From Swiss-Prot:
Sites where the protein binds 4-amino-2-methyl-5-(diphosphooxymethyl)pyrimidine: Q36, Y37, R38, D39, K40, N68, T106, K136
Lineage of source species: Bacteria, Pseudomonadati, Pseudomonadota, Gammaproteobacteria, Pseudomonadales
Catalytic reaction annotation: 2-[(2R,5Z)-2-carboxy-4-methylthiazol-5(2H)-ylidene]ethyl phosphate + 4-amino-2-methyl-5-(diphosphooxymethyl)pyrimidine + 2 H(+) = thiamine phosphate + CO2 + diphosphate; 2-(2-carboxy-4-methylthiazol-5-yl)ethyl phosphate + 4-amino-2-methyl-5-(diphosphooxymethyl)pyrimidine + 2 H(+) = thiamine phosphate + CO2 + diphosphate; 4-methyl-5-(2-phosphooxyethyl)-thiazole + 4-amino-2-methyl-5-(diphosphooxymethyl)pyrimidine + H(+) = thiamine phosphate + diphosphate
One Pfam family hit: TMP-TENI
Organism from which the protein derives: Pseudomonas aeruginosa (strain ATCC 15692 / DSM 22644 / CIP 104116 / JCM 14847 / LMG 12228 / 1C / PRS 101 / PAO1)
Keyword Ribosomal protein in record: no
Pathway: Cofactor biosynthesis; thiamine diphosphate biosynthesis; thiamine phosphate from 4-amino-2-methyl-5-diphosphomethylpyrimidine and 4-methyl-5-(2-phosphoethyl)-thiazole: step 1/1
GO biological process: thiamine biosynthetic process; thiamine diphosphate biosynthetic process
InterPro entries for this protein: Aldolase_TIM, ThiamineP_synth_sf, ThiamineP_synth_TenI, TMP_synthase
Cofactor(s) demanded: Mg(2+)
Gene this chain is encoded by: thiE
EC number: 2.5.1.3
Annotated binding of Mg(2+), by residue: D69, D87
Protein name, UniProt field: Thiamine-phosphate synthase
Recorded superkingdom: Bacteria
Molecular functions per Gene Ontology: magnesium ion binding; thiamine-phosphate diphosphorylase activity
């Protein structure tokens, strides 16, 4: 599948109290193309159950599930993987998951990290944070000038992350971003219906004018 559009990322605090599955399904109905399951807890049994349920939802809606920082879980479920800079070897993950798996890499605000990730077999690279982020407030800041430098040098999808909203996403897409990764601007909502509305609005930004 072409990696372009809304990239929804879960948050265990935002999506507690039974909100995970209905809110994620709402995002998928709204057009999310990728879904990253991000849960840093040590409850492996629960994480497996949740990831299996999310995989079923993604399959139903024609989206791809990506697991954050757990190559073994990704391999067990036959889904994609996202690695941060301290989450282990990308080349080892590629060897484990195979040539067809989607594997993404966090590159912060450094083009050199992105080029290294490409060499190690990444399917996409992620730059950010571009704006103030509730999830990672101390992350290095990235600039739109970085996108101008990256686009001609990287021949794979570019993801932007970090405090992205419906107001700021269009400027990033205009600079060549293929995927906008969103957490709070999508899931910090009072209802699943509101999540779906927001997802449709983000997805519409990628439609031809």
């Amino acid at each position: 599948m072409k990696l372009r559009g809304l990239y929804a990322i879960t948050d265990s605090q935002l999506l507690d109290d039974g909100r995970l599955l209905p809110y994620v399904e709402a995002a998928l109905r709204g057009g999310a193309r990728l879904l990253q399951y991000r849960d840093k807890s040590s409850d492996q049994a629960r994480r497996l159950r949740e990831a299996e349920s999310l995989r079923e939802l993604c399959e139903r809606h024609g989206a791809q599930l990506i697991v954050n920082d757990d190559a073994e879980l990704a391999a067990r479920l036959g889904v994609g993987l996202h690695l941060g800079q301290t989450d282990g070897s990308l080349s080892a993950a590629r060897a484990l998951l195979g040539r067809q798996a989607i594997i993404g890499a966090t590159c912060h605000a450094q083009l050199e990290l992105a080029e290294q990730a490409v060499a190690e077999g990444a399917s996409y690279v992620a730059f950010g944070r571009f704006f103030n982020s509730s999830t990672k407030p101390g992350a290095p800041a990235a600039s739109v000038e970085l996108l101008d430098q990256a686009r001609p040098r990287l021949h794979l999808p570019i993801t932007a992350i970090g405090g992205i909203s419906l107001d700021t996403a269009p400027g990033l897409i205009a600079r060549g971003v293929d995927l906008v990764a969103v957490i709070h601007a999508l899931f910090a909502a009072a209802s699943a219906a509101e999540v779906e509305r927001r997802a449709r609005a983000f997805s519409a930004l990628f439609e031809p004018a």
